[in-house]
Swiss-Prot record:
Coiled coil: none
UniProt topology in membrane: Peripheral membrane protein
Keyword S-adenosyl-L-methionine assigned: no
Protein family (similarity comment): Belongs to the TRAFAC class translation factor GTPase superfamily. Classic translation factor GTPase family. LepA subfamily.
Residues that, per the record, bind GTP: 14-19, 131-134
GO cellular component: plasma membrane
Protein name (database record): Elongation factor 4
Reaction it catalyzes: GTP + H2O = GDP + phosphate + H(+)
HAMAP family: LepA (MF_00071)
Enzymatic class: hydrolase
Length: 596
């Protein structure tokens, strides 16, 4: 027990977490040189292509320290992006310490601060590590000051290293051994193990990553999952070195995996407690706060035959991704599909990509919206995440939109651009503090503005230097309206959007113009209108294609031409009554790309 060290690596995006973990694995001989590859822990293709970590991964390494003892290091590589902060908090719950990795060239960024506070709230020992020390622009003294000023932890003994070249890796390992406390827990107590993560393997069933708090778990034990009350026999117990390695037993303080041939997908929910069915523990461990979805979108299979496969795919993904929320939805334009809740736009993109790649599905996605609170005239308060569910205007007392508190760290020279952007997005400034060259700005912004394209715009106005961290604070009444789109007088439910009244005319105008480009011309005029209630705020017409019916009349009588033109006109009129308009897939995505 006293030689076990459990820790996580936390950092902002691109500060070198995954590379540092590669070096630690290499140094401790977890993999042979030929098996080593860059970002060995980023197991999904998407993670490698985008160069981001999405899922937390765990590794157990043996390290022979300078004092001659052999230490067992269990470490968890965590994501850095704001959308995946719940993954970070889950990883931290199974550790006693955390390495706070900061890029020695870039310094402290918003996500570093947010993840570090999460670790400090859980009473973890946080060790600052300055990475990328080999870069010419590295400035360790300035960064140490930033760590002390902005985060408020002592950085005098911060370890400097370069994960890329391998300088200072030994110092990092020694610091871990010296400063991170060993786990507390009794091996002879009844088993208590926390499920940190789980995923579905087509051959083995559910694989659970667990941290054993008390007791020990062996192959062949009968384990009880406390929330479901079901008992399963354990087939395999072991650790990741990053390869799956069977050890037959896990004792208090260790992190490893358990496979018990659980076939139903939600047999071992994340955050649950496992115990042995014969001598069970009296109380379950406190689990994790369920991550609340912030953005909702309707996703529909292009072919209705895929509906069942789509549902299975979502079930399997939601096991691996505890924050995914979904419920069936029916749209008159797109048929049957699901309303899915995500943590942010990046999360939504990743899930769409995983559905397309891993499950081979062709899907249409509607415009994402956030969750609104509606106070109706009869005193009820309902919450809606789909514009189509908004009640009639005369039944609504007020619409409340979610407000987030955004903490932005930005270099002084880009402060003006960032403030202008926040004002455009209807933000209210709450705080502004100078730390050397960095400025910490706090704004309250409507969540709908933040989740759409705020992050991209923030990066482009500050040339990539500003960083953002945000969290929900409250609902606030606002003058929101639903803009409906009508094509030849028929409402298309999948194109409706909720927006602020001040932006509604501009957005309605943009949307109908965009649709005009995307909807193919027919034999009759197509009227595209944007309306609030019965009030049309923008309209455009896709002109008809028409044949020149008088071409074959040469010379002569005007009444003959009139007769042919009248006949064409009557035909078009009949066609318009029965004809229906195909709305192409790109039109549903047009709503996403509206840039107000």
């Amino acid at each position: 027990m006293k030689n076990i060290r459990n820790f996580s690596i936390i950092a902002h995006i691109d500060h070198g977490k995954s590379t540092l973990s590669d070096r630690l694995i290499q140094h401790c001989g977890g993999l042979q040189a030929r098996e080593m590859e860059a970002q060995v822990l980023d197991s999904m293709d998407i993670e490698r292509e985008r160069g981001i970590t999405i899922k937390a991964q765990s590794v157990t390494l043996d390290y022979k320290a300078k004092d001659g003892e052999i230490y067992q290091l269990n470490f968890i590589d965590t994501p850095g992006h704001v959308d995946f902060s719940y993954e970070v908090s889950r990883s931290l719950a199974s550790c006693e310490g955390a390495l706070l990795v900061v890029d020695a060239g870039q310094g402290v960024e918003a996500q570093t601060v947010a993840n570090c506070y999460t670790a400090l709230e859980m009473d973890l020992e946080v060790l600052p590590i300055l990475n990328k020390i080999d870069l010419p622009q590295a400035d360790p003294e300035r960064v140490c000051e930033e760590i002390e000023h902005i985060i408020g932890i002592d950085a005098t003994d911060a370890v400097t290293c370069s994960a890329k070249t391998g300088i200072g890796i030994e110092d990092v390992l020694e610091t871990i051994v010296k400063n991170i406390p060993s786990p507390a827990g009794q091996i002879d107590a009844p088993l208590q193990a926390l499920i940190v993560d789980s995923w579905f393997d087509n051959y083995q069933g559910v694989v659970s990553l667990v941290r054993v708090i008390n007791g020990e778990v062996k192959k062949g034990d009968k384990m009880l999952v406390m929330s479901t009350g079901q008992v399963h026999q354990i087939d395999k117990v072991g650790i990741f070195t990053p390869k799956q390695t069977d050890t037959g037993v896990l004792r208090a303080g260790e992190v490893g995996f358990i496979i018990a041939g659980i076939k139903e997908i939600h047999g071992a929910p994340v955050g649950d407690t496992i115990t042995i069915s014969k001598k069970e523990t009296a109380n379950a461990l406190p689990g994790f706060k369920k991550a609340q979805p912030q953005v909702y979108a309707g996703i529909f299979p292009i072919s209705s035959d895929d509906y069942e496969n789509f549902r299975d795919a979502l079930n399997k993904l939601s096991l691996n991704d505890a924050s995914l929320f979904f419920e069936p939805e029916n749209s008159s334009a797109l048929g049957f599909g699901f309303r899915i809740g995500f943590l942010g736009m990046l999360h939504m993109e990743i899930i769409q990509e995983r559905l397309a790649r891993e499950y081979d599905l062709d899907l249409i996605t509607t415009a994402p919206t956030v969750n609104y609170e509606i106070a109706s005239t009869n005193g009820d308060v309902i919450s809606i995440d789909n514009p189509a569910d908004l009640p009639a205007i005369n039944n609504i007392e007020e619409i409340r939109e979610p407000i987030v508190q955004a903490n932005i760290l930005v270099p002084q020279e880009y402060l003006g651009n960032v403030i202008t952007l926040c004002i455009e997005k209807r933000g209210v400034q709450k705080d502004l503090i100078y730390h050397g060259n960095q400025v910490a700005v706090t704004y309250e912004l409507p969540m709908a503005e933040v989740v759409m394209d705020f992050f991209d715009k923030l990066k482009s106005t500050s040339r990539g230097y500003a960083s953002l961290d945000y969290h929900f604070i409250r609902f606030e009444a606002a003058d929101m309206v639903r803009v409906d789109v009508m094509i030849n007088g028929d409402r298309v439910d999948a194109l409706a959007m909720i927006t602020h009244r001040a932006n509604s005319v501009a957005r309605g105008r943009l949307l109908v113009d965009k649709l005009k480009e995307l909807i193919h011309r027919q034999m009759f005029d197509i009227a595209i209108q944007a309306a609030i209630g019965n009030n049309v705020i923008a309209r455009t017409t896709v002109k008809q294609l028409r044949k020149n019916v008088t071409a074959k009349c040469y010379g002569g009588d005007i009444s003959r031409k009139k007769k042919l033109l009248q006949k064409q006109k009557d035909g078009k009129k009949r066609m318009k009554q029965v004809g229906n308009v195909e709305v192409p897939q790109e039109a549903f995505l047009a709503v996403l790309k509206l840039d107000s």
